[in-house]
């Protein structure tokens, strides 16, 4: 395991005794994480879960004027376009308004340890290309609520792709503490990659969190979570996990009440990247703790990378074939023997990246 060095201003992961005077702030990030496949087939994903996601969130966007929804995975947007074109066109209006937010930057929410650097960059490139062509926007973050560990190269790759932040909730699934007494280095800070480039890191907590029609500005748990950092800020997922859909009506109403409330917590109905943008440029915020290392899971993550070895073998063989095809195509064009088959290569990579999904390549799906 790579050595991990934690560099914190104040010297403690949570800096409990170094809270700032400012009011606690909660970035409420609505999501409906949808597995491309897991305990069901892709046909079920498209017929039930993709439909539920777009239909339910269009309803919430119409009903609640402050509701902001975040959703990741270019392949799921492509399925929306193919199978639910009327709803897709309606969704585009809310994307233009900034209320349906494109998160994650990628073609799919792939595993974050097995794929090569080339695969990572292709995944981001193809995702961003789709978002530009379809919606006229680009994503700015890595949004992986449900992956099983994150390599030290991830912040370097993200930074070189022009991205500014990363979030997940999965490290809470660790069985044993890893960073002192904690399962993660801190809840909000900077993550430094192997070349020294940094992105912002935010721990999102449980993505299936729900509330029952309360004023979240008065919520004691949000206040306590915000107090775990010297920033007095919490980044909080809420919604559903794995099967898509949407947050509950009561949860959305709780955020709406919090926005109007006068309690000790300032509520923000946030896009997945708003926190990162609020702290740019990062060099102006020396109070941000810095982590320099990898973010791994123990029991759960270990099984993902020691089983279904054949799938990992086929993955690597396809990465090598993709590299060979790219070299051959570029050489042929350079020699004026053939036109570079960009569309063919991109479509092949999309089909391949689809199988690098974090429950596919790891062997954790049926």
Question: What residue ranges belong to the model's regions?
Answer:
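Bacterial N-terminal signal peptides
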Residues: 1-9
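Sec/Tat signal peptide C-region and signal peptidase I cleavage site
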Residues: 11-15
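Catalytic-domain carbohydrate-binding cleft regions of carbohydrate-active enzymes
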Residues: 16-366
